[in-house]
Amino acid sequence: MGKKHSPRFLATVEQSRAAIQECNITQFASMLDDGGEIVVIDVREQHEYDAGCFEGALHLGKGVIERDIEKHPISEDARIVLYCGGGFRSAIAAESLTRMGYSNVYSLWGGWRSLVAADLASPNQ
């Protein structure tokens, strides 16, 4: 069962979604298959990340991503895919990175749940 979100939060998410690039799980899988460089960033909270993550994902929670992304060697034109639980927090974070000058940022619609459903990731046992 999904979480119930406030109308203001949902409005913020929709504004961000209108301003960013999104990909679905099929498009994400194609990005992985095409062999190009891709930086995957998990923007979930630490306890969510600890429970399981996409293999090789960098963990930069939504609360610190703007502050900490430049601590990592990621070029402004690198293909970056952000994910959270379902695609809401990652959309907001993607908008922030776009404003910071990163030009090839995507939010994975469906997030962690879509990764697990597609067998691209699994929760820790």
Question: Which residues fall in each region the model found?
Answer:
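Rhodanese-like catalytic fold shared by cysteine-dependent sulfurtransferases
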Residues: 1-39, 46-79, 88-125
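Short, surface-exposed ligand- or partner-binding patches at beta-edge/loop junctions that are enriched
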Residues: 82-84
